[in-house]
């Protein structure tokens, strides 16, 4: 499929052909959802913790004698049923990450790219270069392209002025092509790819 290449000023700069093997798949929500779940589980800190009965600071002495009171038999006040006792089966520090085959992760990225193209939410720009590190000028350029909520993917490295100018614009994320991922593609409205990013993706998946 051919798409028109734009400049940051909104002018036409030729056309680029996109590979159907990357951008022309019929999007499968189940594969995309698996990759998103994998990403979000992997980034969870897992620092949640509640003290169990062995960890709470409370006396371990028997509460009262075993027989003769008419009350239920109890021992330690650290037991979970008592106020101030330990939590039964509480959260512990752990990793939430789970495995996902590399082929499924790669397939999920291709389906996410295909979904964006099908929704007509991909814009190709010739180059991501700013003459000066001024947010106002770049924000104006984005407005001319209709970019109010976007993920922008550049080549292997993002040009310095462009990176500085873009980092303060709300709802706009800028990543090098090696940082492209399913979750960030889906959480933003438009996907902006530089020609260098398109070439790198086609090289990666060929």
From Swiss-Prot:
Keyword annotations: Ribonucleoprotein, Ribosomal protein, RNA-binding, rRNA-binding
Naturally occurring in which organism (per UniProt): Sinorhizobium medicae (strain WSM419) (Ensifer medicae)
Keyword Ligase: no
Coiled-coil region: none
Its biological purpose: One of the primary rRNA binding proteins, this protein initially binds near the 5'-end of the 23S rRNA. It is important during the early stages of 50S assembly. It makes multiple contacts with different domains of the 23S rRNA in the assembled 50S subunit and ribosome. Forms part of the polypeptide exit tunnel.
Subunit details: Part of the 50S ribosomal subunit.
GO biological process, one term: translation
Descriptive protein name: Large ribosomal subunit protein uL4
UniProt cross-references to NCBIfam families, sorted A to Z: rplD_bact (TIGR03953)
Gene Ontology terms, MF aspect: rRNA binding; structural constituent of ribosome
A GO-annotated cellular component: ribonucleoprotein complex
UniProt biased composition (Basic residues): 64-77
Entries under Pfam families matching the protein: Ribosomal_L4 (PF00573)
Chain positions covered by the region annotation Disordered: 63-93
Protein family according to the UniProt entry: Belongs to the universal ribosomal protein uL4 family.
InterPro entries in UniProt: Ribosomal_uL4 (IPR002136), Ribosomal_uL4-like (IPR013005), Ribosomal_uL4_dom_sf (IPR023574)
